[in-house]
Structures are given as C-alpha cells and as structure tokens.
Amino acid sequence: MKLVWRARALADLESLMSYIAERSEPAAERLQAAIEACASGLTQHPFLYRPGRVEGTREAVVHPNYILIYRVGAETVEIVRVVHSRQQYP
C-alpha cells in the first residue's frame, strides 16, 4: 500500500511541530519520529487502529495527546488530519 498525506494533515503536522519546537526541540523531534513511524506502519497494518468518529476513517493514537485520522483505500492509506486529543473533532 502507498502512504499519502493530505495537505490538511501536513499543515496540521507543521503547525504542531512548530508549536512544540518553540518549547522543546528534542520533544518535537521525538513526537515527529513517533508520528512518522506510526504513519508508515499503517501501510502494513491499516486496520490495526479503531474506527474513526467520522464514517470511513480510522484513528491511530500516536501519543496520549495526538491522533492520526486516516482512510484506507484499495491501494492507499491516506492521512487526512493530525489532531490533539482535546481538540474538538470532527
């Protein structure tokens, strides 16, 4: 399967990393590595995580505070959002 990041998910990730890096660069690097590792693992096990709150999505809890929202297609796993667990979503 191919991994695809939607523009909104990339913007979420960039904003999140910028915010965390202002406070701690090492923490931002660790979180980004965890998010990227989780995302790449989705190509091997796309149904490992729970069904999402939005129909047709799934939610991977990367860290107690951060969730990857994704869709599984025939040939792709599409990351659609990266959200904080306290963020109102959808």
Give the positions of each predicted feature.
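Absolute protein N-terminus
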Residues: 1-2, 90
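Enriched for short, Lys/Arg-rich terminal
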Residues: 66-67, 71-90
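A beta-hairpin/wing motif
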Residues: 57-63
